[in-house]
Amino acid sequence: MRTIIGDSVNKSTKLKSDRFRSMWDGKIKGEKYDSPDFSSGEVNGDVLLLRYNLYNDEFESKKTINGNTHFVERTLSKVVIYKTNKYFFLPYYYKGGKNFNVGYLSLITELDSIRLYRKDEVKFQPATFSPTTIEIGFPPRFIKRKLFFIQKKEATPIQIGKRKMIKLIESLSLDIELK
């Protein structure tokens, strides 16, 4: 014999799982690649087919369309040209200079004493279940964001906010559009 509390918990759990299944088709939303297709690019002057895995922050390469996929070696000496952008494998600091990382930064512009970079990042967000019908649950998904960095002379690049980057570009009278 079931109790009222036991029945309500089972019905509630079934309702949550049914609602989640109707929302999620079994696929992860979003894309971990900049583009899922390989595009022509260069690695230190060698012409290859490339695609950029934003989630793992690495380039995948092929010599031919039907060739095997290889990963571009992540060293400071490698310069990757992908979709007309130059990517440098550099150490950098996130905001506040607390978190240090090493990865690919895309050069926006280079002036006498400063370089401006952009970094496209993808973070994986696991599924969230809504405990009630009022709250919203989400399927697992990749979330894209753009970060901006400034490098003075040969110092380590440091993240700056988009507003500060726009003000800097305006103060330097540069004709650059932040995409």
Identify the function of each model-found stretch.
Residues 33-164:
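Aromatic-patch recognition
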Residues 168-179:
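Long, compositionally biased interface segments
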